[in-house]
């Protein structure tokens, strides 16, 4: 017999894989090196994204006329208004960063997916969120969706990148920087930090 309460069970949901044409409806940029781009369009009817860690294929044409596919987390889906928000990292000089740098209202692209959602209940007593810049959209979305009774610790390589955008503080959460010389990926750095942290005596979820 499972000891996991129903409200703490992870649920997996599958969706029909559909390609959709989307149009840029709004572009915002901030000092954290990200562009927040909103997309709309009739093809978004029926779109679903139930988990903060979902991913879609963003399909666009680069400067050479080549079709490029990149994975992105839906930062927010407003089903009522039919608006999908994606966040693009502008550093690194990649094709997607270049596209986002030039993004303007009226430009079009395609998205595919998500194939499904792994829904991690927000009713955990404590959440540990770890990531580098590529994880910021998922972390921001999770923090915004946590209930007021939740508590979270966030470990990042660049805490200022999270602070540059307003994140609703419905839940109680605190931000810490992971430092290492030379820099390494968070699974490496966070393991040492987690061993030094006083973990709360409650049902927790790390992500």
Which functions belong to the PLM regions below?
Residues 95-207:
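FNR/FR-type flavoprotein reductase catalytic core
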Residues 1-7:
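OB/S1-fold single-stranded nucleic-acid-binding modules
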Residues 9, 14, 18-101:
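Ferredoxin-reductase
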